[in-house]
Amino acid sequence: MLAIRSSNYLRCIPSLCTKTQISQFSSVLISFSRQISHLRLSSCHRAMSSSRPSAFDALMSNARAAAKKKTPQTTNLSRSPNKRKIGETQDANLGKTIVSEGTLPKTEDLLEPVSDSANPRSDTSSIAEDSKTGAKKAKTLSKTDEMKSKIGLLKKKPNDFDPEKMSCWEKGERVPFLFVALAFDLISNESGRIVITDILCNMLRTVIATTPEDLVATVYLSANEIAPAHEGVELGIGESTIIKAISEAFGRTEDHVKKQNTELGDLGLVAKGSRSTQTMMFKPEPLTVVKVFDTFRQIAKESGKDSNEKKKNRMKALLVATTDCEPLYLTRLLQAKLRLGFSGQTVLAALGQAAVYNEEHSKPPPNTKSPLEEAAKIVKQVFTVLPVYDIIVPALLSGGVWNLPKTCNFTLGVPIGPMLAKPTKGVAEILNKFQDIVFTCEYKYDGERAQIHFMEDGTFEIYSRNAERNTGKYPDVALALSRLKKPSVKSFILDCEVVAFDREKKKILPFQILSTRARKNVNVNDIKVGVCIFAFDMLYLNGQQLIQENLKIRREKLYESFEEDPGYFQFATAVTSNDIDEIQKFLDASVDVGCEGLIIKTLDSDATYEPAKRSNNWLKLKKDYMDSIGDSVDLVPIAAFHGRGKRTGVYGAFLLACYDVDKEEFQSICKIGTGFSDAMLDERSSSLRSQVIATPKQYYRVGDSLNPDVWFEPTEVWEVKAADLTISPVHRAATGIVDPDKGISLRFPRLLRVREDKKPEEATSSEQIADLYQAQKHNHPSNEVKGDDD
């Protein structure tokens, strides 16, 4: 048997007809190829040797005639007259395109042998399959159009929303990634938190109603995560690798993609634009949420030789299959920069609300005033003690939101967010806030917060305040605790501070010394900077969680479980007193031994451990900040101004920003040019020069009157001290929280140090800035800056 090569048909199409005829012509040719494949070889030979036209010649002739009737023979004005398709010439007399000789494929090139084992289909079955294929494509097309036309329904108030009217896929079918991408696109045009939460809630409800098994993947992608933070799973792809994937997927050069990225400042927009200008003959299967999520996890697992190439190819396969706005949001997800004005907390709130509408298990507790608000609160609270979507989401679906606290508990081996303290400016303020309440004061150590889990199998896991796994960084800590825990202790979770310590001089060393230690795979024999563990809380002991117990009980459990060894493991130095003079002396003593100040905690009233919360039941008092704003702040340099005079050649001042967690944006708060030694200024200028970008990020909020000379990628975190905070018409920090139209700025900011232990998104939040402003003793309307601050 012989069959027509479809690829050879298609190669001849461009030389036979204009671009508008291609779709008509190609479908005819595919049908012709199947019909001719059933002709016997002998019949073909007779037809070719006969003086009459062959079957192929007749079919081609008919196709040309049909194409001429459907499309007028006019000059193609849609492309440049200087550009010609391959195999075309320009007739000078007629001024129209004609097919040059030799461009048609030879008959033998159009025929290829078919395996004898293949059973030829009848013409009827061939035509029937063509119809099915066409119907499937039409159905896919209509499903996409239907989804785009319906996506606006997600903006309805949840009470008025019907998931069945929104879904464009059958129950049990995988959720299309386009659905999530279109929902993201809808959110991108909104700024109100309530509207954004409603859209997310309705999106999640639609997934629950159709394909609940896809909910975990949908929640992870919405939160722009691929795994729990403590697992340390990251995509591990740089911008250059993503650029390569985009260029190869969409037929662009890397230089072209880089140029567009510089112009647009958003690789997602570059990917979307590249896809929109690319035509494809054969469309891959549409992406699903699960396909994207599973591929992300596969990318994260790639390691070793050629891992970057493998990651790039996986990304490319996803990009090739994208359509509409999918390239934009797929690329941003790959960059872990979704930037849609909502955070993981918003996703949790939406998840809780979606569960209420899907609730089939139980009714809300009696006297629940607002089930939606209560459900959102429950999911957020559960996430603080068990931050694992893979556990929470199935529990939510099977047991309901009201039972979630019973089914999802604090678990050994899964770190919780640390309880944090609010700043205060003096001992008198402490006594005023803690009237008639027993409280204790502890030294505030200048080290690295650590949450240490000791498993029942005898292994340790050490986590940072951000749930990063630091076990390999502190092997000496694990050895010390193994030696000093009492035999009765089989498992525990310890909250403590790991501090650099000189054992010969019996002296606490500054944080800067601690930061010189290697961060991964540390060998005990190579350690040059020793550390001491200062323990102040016990959250779990021998299978029993203690976070609901008051501090007095937790601390007793701590003291009973370990032996102290000075320089290796010590309990935080503490005193319980409400005498103002005694507390002042204790504060001075803490500073003398190298501590930052004091942490003041309620002892037996309102004294439970509140995970991931900056609580009024813990206060911090820093000696250096009693005459300023009460605390230092951690800010991100997002731009700079060229230096003049003796600072020529370096940056003379930097524009700093705080971070708004809910809006996912950096908001300008001050310019800083003081606190730098010449060496530090050179170092910071050199470091940030490699982070210069052409235009500010879309998620930077800066006043119109500020015109920096250069903009930076948000990469560094600087600890800054200031005299006070003021309302500012120039800066955008906390706009809308204290003043509806104006932001907050720092007066007389001074750089203290670079915080290498923090990511930009972990900088001081706009909400914290507002809290500091409101806590100022002299807070009055005249405390306002009319112009720019230096």
UniProtKB/Swiss-Prot annotation:
Cofactor(s) for this UniProt protein: Mg(2+)
Region annotation (Disordered) ranges: 64-142, 757-790
Biased composition (Basic and acidic residues): 781-790
Active-site residues from the entry: K444
Residue ranges annotated as motif Nuclear localization signal 2: 505-512
Alphabetical keyword list: ATP-binding, Cell cycle, Cell division, DNA damage, DNA recombination, DNA repair, DNA replication, Ligase, Magnesium, Metal-binding, Mitochondrion, Nucleotide-binding, Nucleus, Repeat, Transit peptide
Motif range (Nuclear localization signal 1): 68-75
Binding site for Mg(2+) 2: E596
Family in the record: Belongs to the ATP-dependent DNA ligase family.
Protein name: DNA ligase 1
Organism: Arabidopsis thaliana
